[in-house]
């Protein structure tokens, strides 16, 4: 009996262990059931947008249902398409990296895809061209505002003329590489960007240069015509040398440490033509002077220089022009601009190498861009980097190299353990920032200019902010993380706007893992404000304006943090004319975290109209249960003038961005504008003595529906001074035709200037922003008032 009991007990124990094992396997399957988007595309988390596009295209051609007979091909392709749609978008990628797929639940992405032929022939047409930079929404502004000269091709993947242009654009890019930046924008992927630039047909080619409006190219789309169009915008000076200016021109350049590249044109042999000379002057601008001499008219001078036939020669500073046997003088046999350019660059002196003894002094008094090397480093010795001194001269930035083997302790103190580039701001060795982007000429130029003029520094254990220090914004990041790299330029912009108020620093978590663990950093980038003992994590988009909004919100909170008690007193017992919006959330909930910056932004937009609060359902779980909150985030609106007071409306919209939430909330505000009929329009607007602003709309018009809440805000903003009315042009078509309304919505001002009858057409207002419209019409009414007062004085 005892044996049987033990056997039964043993069997029961085995069964329990088996069940537990199966439960654990099931839980593991649930945890890992979501496919990793990076794995689906076969890319690393450090992949660039170009690499993501290339990987997706390769998979699309292989797995597309048009070519793949797998019964499940459609669903499989939807998965990789979803992965691509998320990872190509900077904001969605950041959310995915931080919260996983749950952070994307509100996003309607990846529901469809294009045909196989689209991916084969139309998708990413410039991704394999190194000379052409494909610019996305997040890269465009930085590129055209960098100070560099850009020629950009705005195209659409389905446009046949765009595909016809592609081979020519590639040839043009190769020929002009180094003279200007060649870009391409896919308007199929970046519709809003192209619309903001006024692009409504394809292809559209524009020159962008700092200090001038974009210039559109209208000519024939041939390489020669494109080159001829671009050349005048390239800064280049070619000097014709002759007996009257030869000596002074040479001596002035040599005294400044600049050499001369001179092509001598004689009756025999070949010299460089005009366009080649101009290209070389552009390529070598600031490094070498470019000139030419006509030996047919300057025969004596050419004889003195022992020039007997056409030749192209580089004379370094200090060289003797008549001593051409000198090894420093370089004779060039090529007639190709790029070949000559490379030879001359190789002949120029290398960047200055800084000694350990002089480093501290140099960094204390001057701005520097330094290449940190470990012995011989081919990358820092690239001839093209000699141009950095020219590009950074206007910012008073010097360029040099420091070999960490010459003083390992210095590099160790800076936490530099591998070759890198750093910008020092002229305030000592601790005020620096390390470059984490591509080590290419124009990327380094942009980084150096941004960094030395901003107030972001690299942090480590010795200078990490403590509790008793100033307010700091610290960006915890990893260099391999693309959203992290995209955030850095935005931090620099924000640091300039908040200089003297908040200090900015970055901490590399791949180097300072202990510090990052101490602050519970689990995703990159994580941006935190340390305000003495208070810590606030930023959860917005990677742009300076939203960072500034976040800081302003910390100073002047737009959202009330509610407790069960304050919910009762402020929301439940609100005044009859008061409205509240409340977000019921849990701190661990990914969609809740993604909502928070949008929630705060919405609160600022409706400040003074609707009160906004939030309540932590993890902290007050019993209260949320009593309020029947069953999921997070739960957004509720408690309206005005409704009994009982616990009545609310629940937001069920798909999009949780600030604009969508704002528009939804404003629908519940009591209407401040008047609906006008033809009769009331004539009686009150045309023949009345009030100032009116009118919105002419059609009910079926999407932009009209979006503008409606904005117009209601306007009506409240000008209440008491200007009356606001709406005219339904579907119901009153004749009235709108008589007022020459050609599109919807149309905003018109009808000011009263003392005459018996107003103009039927009013004054057009070309804006859909309530604040801007209010400013425009207020100024106009004040101007009319001043004219009337002046007229009355004259009458007296």
UniProtKB/Swiss-Prot annotation:
Residue pairs linked by disulfide bridges in the UniProt entry: 159-162, 481-484, 589-592, 701-704
- Could you say which residues form the signal peptide? 1-33
Instruction: Output the Gene Ontology cellular-component terms.
Output: endoplasmic reticulum lumen
Does Membrane count among this protein's keywords? Answer: no
Where the protein is mainly located, per its record?
endoplasmic reticulum
Q: Which residues are glycosylated?
A: 531, 753
Q: Which residues form the Thioredoxin domain?
A: 131-233, 455-554, 558-668, 672-780
Biological process (GO) annotations?
A: ERAD pathway; IRE1-mediated unfolded protein response; protein folding in endoplasmic reticulum
GO MF annotation: an example: oxidoreductase activity, acting on a sulfur group of donors, disulfide as acceptor
Recorded hits in InterPro entries, A to Z, give: DnaJ_domain (IPR001623), ER_disulfide_reductase (IPR052460), ERdj5 (IPR021170), ERdj5_TRX_C (IPR035674), ERdj5_TRX_N (IPR035673), J_dom_sf (IPR036869), Thioredoxin-like_sf (IPR036249), Thioredoxin_CS (IPR017937)
Q: What is this protein called?
A: DnaJ homolog subfamily C member 10
* Highest taxon in the source lineage: Eukaryota
Q: What gene is it encoded by?
A: dnajc10
Q: Where does the record place it?
A: Endoplasmic reticulum lumen
The text the record gives for the protein's domains is: Thioredoxin domains 3 and 4 are the primary reductase domains. The thioredoxin-like regions Trxb 1 and 2 lack a redox-active CXXC motif.
Q: Where is this region: Trxb 2?
A: 349-464
Q: Which UniProt keywords apply?
A: Disulfide bond, Endoplasmic reticulum, Glycoprotein, Oxidoreductase, Redox-active center, Repeat, Signal
Protein function? Endoplasmic reticulum disulfide reductase involved both in the correct folding of proteins and degradation of misfolded proteins. Required for efficient folding of proteins in the endoplasmic reticulum by catalyzing the removal of non-native disulfide bonds formed during the folding of proteins. Also involved in endoplasmic reticulum-associated degradation (ERAD) by reducing incorrect disulfide bonds in misfolded glycoproteins.
* Organism (species): Xenopus laevis (African clawed frog)
Q: What Enzyme Commission number does this protein have?
A: 1.8.4.-
Chain segments carrying region Trxb 1? 236-351
Where does the J domain lie? 36-100
Chain positions of motif Prevents secretion from ER? 793-796
């Amino acid at each position: 009996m005892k044996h049987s009991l033990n056997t039964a007990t043993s069997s029961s124990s085995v069964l329990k262990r088996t069940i537990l094992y199966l439960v654990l396997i099931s839980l593991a399957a649930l945890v890992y059931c979501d496919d990793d988007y990076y794995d689906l595309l076969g890319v690393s988390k450090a992949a660039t947008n170009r690499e993501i596009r290339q990987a997706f295209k390769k998979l699309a051609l292989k797995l597309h249902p048009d070519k793949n007979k797998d019964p499940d091909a459609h669903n499989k392709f939807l998965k990789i398409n979803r992965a691509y749609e998320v990872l190509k978008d900077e904001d969605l990628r950041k959310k995915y990296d931080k919260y996983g797929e749950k952070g994307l639940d509100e996003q309607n992405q990846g529901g469809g895809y294009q045909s196989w032929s689209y991916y084969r022939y139309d998708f990413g047409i410039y991704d394999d061209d190194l000379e052409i930079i494909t610019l996305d929404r997040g890269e465009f502004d930085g590129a055209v505002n960098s100070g560099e000269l850009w020629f950009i091709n705005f195209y659409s993947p389905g446009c046949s003329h765009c595909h016809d242009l592609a081979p020519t654009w590639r040839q043009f890019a190769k020929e002009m590489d180094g003279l200007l930046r060649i870009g391409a924008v896919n308007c199929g992927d970046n519709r809003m960007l192209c619309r903001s630039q006024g692009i409504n047909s394809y292809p559209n080619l524009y020159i962008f240069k700092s200090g001038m409006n974009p210039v559109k190219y209208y000519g024939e789309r041939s390489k020669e015509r494109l080159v001829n169009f671009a050349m005048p915008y390239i800064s280049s000076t070619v000097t014709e040398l002759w007996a009257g200016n030869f000596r002074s021109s040479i001596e002035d350049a040599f005294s400044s440490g600049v050499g001369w590249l001179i092509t001598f044109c004689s009756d025999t042999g070949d010299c460089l033509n005009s366009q080649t000379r101009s290209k070389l002057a552009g390529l070598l601008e600031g490094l070498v002077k470019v000139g030419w001499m006509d030996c047919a008219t300057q025969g004596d001078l050419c004889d003195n220089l022992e020039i007997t036939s056409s030749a192209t020669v580089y004379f370094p500073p200090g060289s003797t022009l008549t001593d051409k046997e000198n090894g420093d003088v370089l004779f060039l046999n090529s007639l190709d601009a790029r070949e000559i350019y490379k030879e001359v660059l190789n002949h120029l002196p290398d960047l200055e190498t800084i000694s350990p003894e002089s480093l501290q002094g140099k960094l204390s008094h001057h701005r520097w861009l330094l290449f940190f090397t470990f012995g011989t480093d081919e990358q820092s010795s690239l001839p093209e980097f000699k141009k950095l001194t020219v590009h950074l001269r206007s910012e008073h930035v010097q360029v040099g190299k420091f070999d960490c083997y010459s003083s390992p302790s210095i590099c160790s103190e800076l936490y530099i353990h591998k070759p890198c580039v750093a910008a020092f701001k002229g305030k000592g060795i601790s005020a620096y920032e390390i470059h984490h982007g591509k080590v290419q000429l124009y990327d380094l130029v942009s980084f150096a200019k941004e960094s030395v003029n901003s107030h972001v520094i690299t942090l480590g254990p010795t200078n990490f902010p403590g509790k008793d220090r100033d307010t700091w914004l610290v960006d915890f990041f990893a260099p391999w993380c693309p959203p992290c790299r995209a955030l850095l330029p935005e931090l620099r912009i924000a640091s300039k706007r908040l200089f003297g108020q908040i200090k900015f620093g970055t901490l590399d978590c791949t180097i300072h893992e202990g510090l990052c663990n101490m602050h519970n950093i689990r995703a990159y980038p994580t941006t935190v404000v340390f305000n003495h003992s208070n810590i606030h994590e930023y959860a917005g988009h990677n742009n300076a304006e939203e960072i500034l909004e976040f800081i302003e919100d910390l100073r002047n909170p737009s959202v009330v943090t509610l407790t069960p008690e304050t919910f009762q007193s402020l929301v439940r017992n609100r005044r009859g004319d008061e409205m509240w919006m409340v977000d019921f959330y849990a701190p661990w909930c990914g969609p809740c975290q993604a909502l928070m910056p949008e929630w705060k932004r919405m609160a600022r937009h409706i400040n003074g109209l609707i009160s906004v609060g939030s309540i932590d359902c993890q902290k007050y779980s019993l209260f949320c249960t009593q309020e029947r909150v069953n999921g997070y985030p739960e957004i509720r609106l408690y309206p005005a003038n409704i009994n009982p007071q616990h009545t609310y409306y629940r937001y069920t919209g798909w999009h949780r961005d600030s604009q969508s939430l704002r528009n939804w909330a404003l629908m519940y505000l009591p209407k401040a504008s008047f609906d006008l009929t033809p009769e009331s329009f004539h009686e009150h607007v045309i023949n009345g003595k009030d100032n009116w602003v009118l919105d002419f709309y059609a009910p079926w018009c999407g932009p009209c529906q979006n503008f409606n809440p904005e117009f209601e805000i306007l009506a409240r903003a000008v209440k008491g001074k200007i009356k606001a009315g709406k005219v339904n042009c579907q119901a009153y078509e004749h009235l709108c035709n008589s007022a020459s309304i050609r599109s919807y919505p149309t905003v018109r001002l009808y000011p009263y200037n003392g005459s018996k009858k107003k103009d039927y057409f009013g004054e057009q207002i070309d804006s859909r922003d309530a604040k801007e419209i209010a400013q425009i019409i207020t100024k106009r009414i004040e101007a009319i008032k001043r004219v009337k007062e002046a007229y009355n004085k004259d009458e007296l």
